[in-house]
Amino acid sequence: MFGFSRTLARSDQLDERTSRFIGMMGEAAEQMTELLDQLGTSARIAADRWEPVLREVDTLELVREADAETPAVGEGASVETEADAVGRALRSLARAARVYGRIDEVTWHVDGRALELAPVNAEAGPVVSGEDVRDLGSLVARQVVEALGGSVALAGETLRVEL
């Protein structure tokens, strides 16, 4: 569906309304692909069949590359991790903090292997920490981080992710 919508979007013969609908189709297809990827990762972790591809990355660069919408400040450190899955996890956590907290911006504060997301208000806290099962991305994010030997913990209005 995603490929089909991209092909249609390239056509010069579409009116504005049709182009808008084709764009919406493409966005929905991307969301579905991400959802299926999250479900697949979660299932492999639960079945103890996940085989992460580890590579060395800088934590600050990882956060910045994973989520251009969320500012990241601080000083990174080199870690060996499954960069793609962790990047998706961090992006999901930040998105959930914004959506469920009904706020426009959160920020990642990076200190070596420790990543702190703030503010995570009272409405978003239970969802982002995985206590309230309303966001698949947050649940899978926690699974990924913990499967790689890290941790996710909420302290006040700060979500701390240790890689």
Predicted regions span which residues?
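Conserved C-terminal segment of the DHp
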Residues: 2-15
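Conserved E/DxxT/N motif and adjacent residues on the DHp alpha2 helix
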Residues: 3, 34-48
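Short flexible loop/turn segments at helix-to-beta-strand junctions
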Residues: 17, 47-57, 78-80
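Short alpha-helical segment of the dimerization/phosphotransfer core of two-component systems
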Residues: 27-32
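A conserved beta-strand-to-alpha-helix junction within the catalytic ATP-binding
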Residues: 53-67, 87
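Glycine-rich/acidic phosphate-handling loop/turn and adjacent ATP-lid/helix
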Residues: 114-139
